[in-house]
Amino acid sequence: MDMIKPDFQQIRRDKFRVEQMNDFPNTWTQQQHQNIRIPNNLDLIGILQNQISVPVQTDLYQDSAATFMNMPQSIHRDPQGPSNWRISDLSQPSTVNHGYDQAGIRPNNVADLLSDHFSSRNQILDRPLYVGRDSIPQSSMIRRSEVSCLDDNQKGCVTVACSGTGNEILRSSYDQGSSSGSYRGEFSFLPSLENQSVAHNASNWNHGPVNVTATSHTNSKKGFPLSLLSDIPPSRDVGNAAVLSTMNIHGPLGPFTGYASILKSSRFLEPAQKMLEEFCISYASKIISRSESTSMEDDDDDDDNLSGFSSSSEPLEPKNRLKKAKLLFLQEEVCKWYKLYNHQLQTVMSSFNTVAGLNTATPYISLALKRTSRSFKALRTAIAEHVKQISSHSSNGNNNNRFQKRQRSLIGNNVGFESQQQHIWRPQRGLPERAVAVLRAWLFDHFLHPYPTDSDKQMLATQTGLSRNQVSNWFINARVRLWKPMVEEIHTLETKAIKNADTSHNIEPSNRPNTVSSPSHEQTLTGLSGTKRSRLEYMDMVGFNRGNVSLTLELRRGVDNVIQTQTQDHQFGTGSQMFHDFVG
């Protein structure tokens, strides 16, 4: 009973495995024929009917499979070798070895019996299928096989032709994968040939009942000589889902689909990067150095020219000087933006160097640098030409400007001369000198009546550029500080003269006798009367107030006192002359 139990467990394992494969019908196409699985005879025949249109008699294989599965024997694996099997009969205690020998050359009795049985019943499948890179041989006599091919980029194929029982290989590979303790997916059904070369493995499989011809590169990874993958196998912690997810990635690879991350993990990254740096970066650096040297030479020449223009000893007009200042400011802005663009392009170049595979963009950046330097050079040349034109025009019209300035300085009036003589650094207090001069002239012209009317105030405000209130305030202050002291001084002089005349007139009649007036005396009287009449006419002409009280000094004037005015005519003449000299 203990010997029968392993058979039932093994059958349950086979059924579970077949159901699991049926749950994923697209694994053959999704994994791109990269797994080799050898199911039982019935599944193998179905696969051959789908892939190769060859008529196969299924009833014969069903009978042979039934007889083989109903054999009263138990199959056990030899722990010393993974491909050595023992078939133990339940009725006989002896154990017969039905696996390969150590050399893998001669099959055992059961394999011979089954192969003879299959070959006698059906002679359709005669030779294994060899699939290479170029073509598939045109042969209709093909043994039961299952073909697994690589991708177009990996250029490798493996053909497995089976002439023995598929259950032995299936069970041996399944037990071997389960006993190893790690899940390898469907690669666990392949025998492990880690320590053998590809040629030796191919010779061993060709001489055995299971013929395998491996056509692959010799640089395949160690441990998987028949593996159709070029990637590293997944670790023990990674499951089958992770393997399928990594294998099902299709589509073009680019810089935005993880291409840079794949290149970073490659061992060819560093030598390829060095080679690209030698051929691209060095050439681009030479171009950039040449362009920078030429641009710097041009900049130095332009600076020399501009400095020559600006250092000219001839002064410029204010208008031309302003234009030249604006042009020089634009030149500084152009230089600043050129340096900024150059720095930005250098930053872009360094960012391209950090990403593998994008170093080929460096020559294009050098072309952009040359284009930018050419544009900025054109701007600088245009600015330099404008500055040169301004300097030439200023030098031509320099003599005319000097002559005009001299004429203005000579023709200018005294007010302009005084304004030029005042110091610029001294703070200005009060009204401007030109306005004060205009107001003072009007005051002396109207000295006898220094009260301007509204129209006079408006006219003076227009001439001086002051407001009407400023004109009124100035006249108020001028009458108090300037005009009133002058009038008081004149009045004191007149009063002194009158007193002196009175004293002299009172003394003379008492000393002289009453005689008849001589003709000379009459002539003096007529002269005095003439001077009196002329003074009265002058007072009427200037509009002097002839009332009893003066508006400013409140002095009484006797109109009838003609004698005093006649006796003081010589005194008044002296005072009037002094007043005229003061005003003039």
Swiss-Prot record:
UniProt subcellular location: Nucleus
UniProt DNA-binding region: 424-486
InterPro entries named in the record: HD (IPR001356), Homeodomain-like_sf (IPR009057), KN_HD (IPR008422), POX_dom (IPR006563), TALE_homeobox (IPR050224)
Gene Ontology terms: cellular component: nucleus
Pfam family, one: POX
Skewed-composition ranges (Acidic residues): 295-305
Organism: Arabidopsis thaliana (Mouse-ear cress)
Region (Disordered): 292-317, 503-529
Comment text on domains: The SR/KY and BELL domains are responsive for the interaction between the TALE/BELL proteins and the TALE/KNOX proteins.
GO BP: inflorescence development; internode patterning; maintenance of floral meristem identity; maintenance of inflorescence meristem identity; pattern specification process; plant organ formation; secondary shoot formation; vegetative to reproductive phase transition of meristem
Family: Belongs to the TALE/BELL homeobox family.
GO MF annotation, one: DNA binding
Keywords per UniProt: DNA-binding, Homeobox, Nucleus, Transcription, Transcription regulation
Region BELL domain, residue ranges: 316-387
Region listing for SR/KY domain, in residue ranges: 266-282
SUBUNIT field: May form heterodimeric complex with the TALE/KNOX proteins STM and KNAT1/BP.
Function, in words: Required for specifying floral primordia and establishing early internode patterning events during inflorescence development.
Protein name, entry field: BEL1-like homeodomain protein 8
UniProt cross-references to SUPFAM superfamilies, sorted A to Z: Homeodomain-like
